[in-house]
Regions:
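Hydrophobic alpha-helical transmembrane segments of multi-pass integral membrane proteins
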Residues: 9-15, 37-53, 122-129, 150-154, ...
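Hydrophobic transmembrane alpha-helices of multi-pass small-molecule transport proteins
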Residues: 51, 71-73, 77, 122-141, ...
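Loop-to-transmembrane-helix transition segments
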Residues: 10-20, 42, 60-84, 150-158, ...
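Glycine-/small-residue-enriched transmembrane alpha-helix faces in small-molecule transporters
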Residues: 1-41, 75, 83, 145-171, ...
Length: 301
């Protein structure tokens, strides 16, 4: 059976909204009083009871194989969360957002090999324009120094883990709701993060509202709303376009900085944002020319 993903405008808007929620992550991670991996652990842990009422009635549709695949996806997401959170202690929020979202270079070849998605004639041109815009944006925000290189490396590694999660959840989204994907994969994430936090940082317990609210913000904005909404859009938007839209996250984070912290955007930053949006528009225009059929992979029972 084939699933048609024709990239309707409403789902493009919903995915941009998901990215807007995800763009709050860097600010909340830096505010958190807990260590980075512990912060990620509580982000996922607190999300499970919130997702359960939504996912419960759909859990029966899962096979044992589906459950194992989702737990594996959760391990990839845990790797992304851990490395992403750690990167904020070494590099800027803008750089971390940029490098973590460079999943395009991983996702595009694998989507072609696994899902048989054809790459439109001008898709790579649109992606290149978007990436150029992101780099132009970053040049106006980042203070380059030697210590930031390690943080950049962590964020880049996080992008590989996120690409793994994106591909695995995309594969199952043809049959399984996004709430089930986030709920079941959350168990894989929380177990992985618990073990990693205990070994690397020592398990920490938040005390008081001042330590809890950043964790709850991460849970609600990222784990429940952001990733859940993004997973939902993956059922309606091709994975290539989805990966390019994710590159708008640094632009949205820059806008947050302008309104929340009164950080003025330079002319170069504004130019970068405009170029990013132009690249995304070019990619969407190509997909509007022809609906893309994504072949489901036949799985053994």
């Amino acid at each position: 059976m084939n699933t048609v993903r024709n990239n309707e405008t409403r789902y493009i808007i919903l995915e941009l909204l998901a990215i807007a929620f995800l763009a709050t992550g860097g600010i909340l991670v830096k505010i958190s009083a807990l260590s980075p991996i512990n912060t990620g652990f509580y982000r996922v842990l607190f999300s499970l009871p919130l997702l359960f009422p939504i996912a419960y009635k759909h859990l029966k549709q899962l096979s044992k194989r589906d459950t194992v695949i989702l737990l594996l996806a959760g391990i990839f997401l845990a790797g992304d969360i851990s490395l992403w959170n750690l990167s904020f202690h070494y590099t800027s929020v803008a750089n971390a957002n940029l490098l973590t979202n460079l999943t395009t270079f991983t996702v595009i070849p694998f989507s072609y090999l696994i899902f048989k998605e054809r790459i439109p004639k001008f898709f790579l041109a649109g992606a290149a324009i978007t990436i150029a815009g992101v780099f132009i944006l970053i040049t106006g925000k980042t203070d380059t120094n030697g210590s930031s290189l390690f943080g950049d490396f962590l964020a880049l590694c996080a992008s590989l883990f996120y690409a793994g999660f994106l591909l695995i959840s995309y594969r199952l989204r043809n049959r399984i709701s996004s709430s089930v994907i986030m709920f079941v994969s959350g168990f894989g994430s929380v177990i992985t993060l618990l073990i990693t936090a205990s070994l690397v940082e020592g398990l920490q317990v938040p005390h008081g509202a001042s330590q809890l609210w950043p964790l709850l913000g991460l849970t609600l904005f990222l784990q429940v709303i952001g990733h859940n909404l993004l997973a939902h859009c993956q059922g309606k938007v091709t994975v290539n376009l989805s990966s390019v839209i994710c590159l708008s996250q640094p632009a949205i984070a820059s806008i947050y900085s302008f309104f929340i912290f009164s950080e003025n955007l330079s002319a170069i930053e504004v130019l970068g944002i405009i170029i990013i949006m132009a690249g995304v528009y070019l990619v969407k225009a190509q997909y509007n020319l022809k609906s893309i059929k994504v072949c489901n992979i036949t799985e053994d029972s």
